[in-house]
Amino acid sequence: MGIYKYIREAWKRPKESYVRQLLWERLQQWRREPAVVRIERPTRLDRARALGYKPKQGIIVVRVRVRRGGLRKPRPKNSKKPATLGVNKITMGKSIQRIAEERAARKYPNMEVLNSYWVGEDGKHKWYEVILVDPYHPAIKADPQLNWLCTGKHRGRAFRGLTSAGKKGRGLRNKGIGAEKVRPSIRAHGRRGK
């Protein structure tokens, strides 16, 4: 069994392996850090490599902290009936992972989001690591596995739901019966929203 398989098996059930102790120590430090932090190397090397990470120039990894649970919606200032305030029990149309990807993309506007993966959570927050690629870097332009990101149509892909997490949230993992209203997009089909 190779090293990546050992790492993968340990992270499948983090509460039952050595990952539990690692997370307990790491989360204490991560809570004190800013919401978006650039890191030197991936925490989950197996997952990062599977999603396209390579240790080369033009690729960075960023750890993002996002809130857990439903939307924290501000309370309207004008008087309304409590029933119509629409503050509690509001579920976002976007997943928390997508929010993390967008925040990383805003922090690094010259880079594009390649993919992201979960690295930890506590009662209040979730942490994701986002792989970012510089589409203008010569090393990326020369890489046959990554140079597809250099074309203009992939600009701002995190904001348009074109990452893996974005496509999942838009329902594009399904096709056939039950997925009639998903394509060409959620907005296009009768503007039913998400």
Curated annotation (Swiss-Prot):
Keyword Ribonucleoprotein attached: yes
InterPro entries: Rbsml_eL15_core_dom_sf, Ribosomal_eL15, Ribosomal_eL15_arc, Ribosomal_eL15_CS, Ribosomal_uL23/eL15/eS24_sf
GO MF entries: RNA binding; structural constituent of ribosome
Protein keywords: Ribonucleoprotein, Ribosomal protein
Alphabetical list of SUPFAM superfamilies matching this protein: Ribosomal proteins S24e, L23 and L15e
Gene Ontology annotations of biological process type: cytoplasmic translation
Gene3D superfamilies, per the entry: Ribosomal protein l15e
Gene Ontology CC annotation, any one: cytosolic large ribosomal subunit
Compositional bias annotation for Basic residues: 184-194
Residue span of region Disordered: 164-194
Database matches in PANTHER family: LARGE RIBOSOMAL SUBUNIT PROTEIN EL15, RIBOSOMAL PROTEIN L15
Protein family: Belongs to the eukaryotic ribosomal protein eL15 family.
Record-given protein name: Large ribosomal subunit protein eL15
Originating organism: Methanocaldococcus jannaschii (strain ATCC 43067 / DSM 2661 / JAL-1 / JCM 10045 / NBRC 100440) (Methanococcus jannaschii)
